[in-house]
UniProtKB/Swiss-Prot annotation:
ATP-dependent RNA helicase involved nonsense-mediated mRNA decay and ribosome biogenesis through rRNA processing. ATP binds at residues 143-150. The lineage of its organism: Eukaryota, Viridiplantae, Streptophyta, Embryophyta, Tracheophyta. This is DEAD-box ATP-dependent RNA helicase 20. It catalyses: ATP + H2O = ADP + phosphate + H(+).
């Protein structure tokens, strides 16, 4: 039996759709019944995952029913809508985007949670990603942090869970979300708990840096959705505190960052324990070669959706100010800047190293500024406290490294200051994207030195494309310096022309 009354109120309504089941249906393993695999579907995917389904119980994963409003959209209207919202799609049998939450076909209890959250319309990634995910197909989503991607996979995950048999004693989760950092995992779990509460879906968050006891108890009680960092999840599996035999919906969030942080072996080990006909959703902000290669191992005939241009661009709502200064001028420049802008608003200051974060924070505090730092050497309790102080405004200045800040969803950051210029232009765009979210205005200040000169030309292009002023010093530096070679600090490919065709 299914867990819940579906849209029709019939608890078995989804169970009749055998052609869309994960096992025992068509060879497309969850694609719509009209789709047939072809060589073109597998271009660039020389070894799609091998399916040994002996002894595996069938499961449902295609729940999408196109609404009349969506069905009525002409091809021209679909093309115009995608162009307006900067949606690029690849794959076979691609569903049309949805313009409203009701068009997705979510059950009423999900729609109630969406309404309570105050959302008015789907974001671009939700508009196209929801019907793709609800069809049960594998999905590659390339979208920035803050784009609404978390709900793009969580709401279909809730529908997926409620269509499966109830957990039995000793069962592991049905949905597994892998995330690179503790902070991101906690944020995902908070959203999963909020939107899954009305259907009594149990969730837990598994990450290192804290005692295992409470996490072990959650797993042993049985939870439908687990959000985890790779290392701690493997610990739990090896100590027999959980298993992945029931996982039929797998999410890899921020896959590019997980690979950057060296999690490739752990990810491969985890996925090897999950049934091969699962549905896999693979999310990344960028599309470098190593991310593409991993996707080919884990995904079969996926949809692909890219939000935004194939080149990273800065948000036009963000005012960008780049000052060319010397290294020795940085701290005095920072203090002068804080004196000018400090109004109680949240200010996020980026530095390259943990040591630099601590040094600048210590100096600021000695000078009377309410600053705290966050980086990977701090305990989980310290990190939680720093974030709480920053979010509440008690300490409105926070210094951070890129890794520590990645995935943090702190609302109302008014200013970003790049004390140290990052190691790539992609990271520059990520950093300044911490402000100017959800239609708000923001300002990003950047200290740029001669040591950063190799980025001057491409940085100038970013500023000009976003309609920003370029200082004569930066423009001059850009004209006299060659840009970094590919793979050494420039933009990474965002995947619009490679891989799945």
């Amino acid at each position: 039996m299914s867990r819940y009354d579906s849209r029709t109120g019939d608890s078995t309504s989804y169970r009749d759709r055998r052609s869309d089941s994960g096992f025992g249906g068509t060879s497309s393993y969850g694609s719509s019944g009209s789709h047939t695999s072809s060589k073109k579907d597998n271009d660039g995917n020389e070894s799609p995952r091998k399916l040994d389904l002996d002894g595996l119980t069938p499961f449902e994963k295609n729940f999408y029913v196109e609404s009349p409003a969506v069905a009525a959209m002409t091809d021209t209207e679909v093309e115009e809508y995608r162009k307006l919202r900067e949606i690029t799609v690849e794959g076979k049998d691609i569903p049309k985007p949805v313009k409203s939450f009701r068009d997705v076909g979510f059950p009423d209890y999900v729609l109630e949670e969406v309404k309570k959250a105050g959302f008015t319309e789907p974001t671009p990634i939700q508009s196209q990603g929801w019907p793709m995910a609800m069809k049960g197909r594998d999905l590659i989503g390339i979208a920035e942090t803050g784009s609404g991607k978390t709900l793009s996979y969580l709401l279909p995950a809730i529908v997926h869970v409620n269509a499966q048999p109830m957990l039995a004693h000793g069962d592991g989760p049905i949905v597994l979300v892998l995330a690179p950092t503790r902070e991101l995992a906690v944020q995902i779990q908070q959203e999963a708990s909020k939107f899954g509460s009305s259907s009594k879906i149990k969730t837990t968050c598994i990450y290192g840096g804290v005692p295992k006891g409470p996490q072990v108890r959650d797993l042993q009680k049985g939870v439908e959705i687990v959000i985890a960092t790779p290392g701690r999840l493997i610990d739990m599996m090896e100590s027999n505190n959980t298993n992945l035999r029931r996982v039929t919906y797998l999410v890899l969030d921020e896959a590019d960052r997980m690979l950057d942080m060296g999690f490739d072996p752990q990810i491969r080990k985890i996925v090897s324990h999950i049934r091969p006909d699962r549905q896999t959703l693979y999310w990344s902000a960028t599309w470098p070669k190593e991310v593409e290669q991993l996707s080919k191992k884990f995904l079969y005939n996926p949809y692909k959706v890219i939000i935004g241009s194939s080149d990273l661009k800065a948000n036009r709502a963000i005012r960008q100010i780049v000052d060319v200064i010397s290294e020795s001028q940085k701290y005095n420049k920072l203090v002068k800047l804080l004196e000018d802008i400090m109004d109680g608003s949240r200010i996020l200051v980026f530095l390259d190293t943990k040591k630099g974060c601590d040094q600048i924070t210590r100096q600021l505090r000695m000078d009377g500024w309410p600053a705290l730092s966050i980086h990977g050497d701090k305990s989980q309790a310290e990190r939680d406290w720093v974030l709480s102080e920053f979010r509440s405004g008690k300490s409105p200045i926070m210094t951070a490294t890129d890794v520590a800040a990645r995935g943090l969803d702190v609302k109302d950051v008014k200013y970003v200051i790049n004390y140290d210029f990052p190691g790539s232009l992609e990271d520059y765009v990520h950093r300044i994207g911490r402000t100017g979210r959800a239609g708000a205005k923001g300002t990003a200040y950047t200290f740029f030195t001669v040591a950063n000169a190799r980025f001057a030309k491409e940085l100038t292009n970013i500023l000009q494309e976003a309609g920003q002023k370029v200082s004569p010093e930066l423009a001059s530096m850009g004209r006299s310096t060659a840009p970094p070679p590919p793979g050494l600090g420039g933009f990474r490919d965002r995947g619009s022309r490679r891989g799945w065709s």
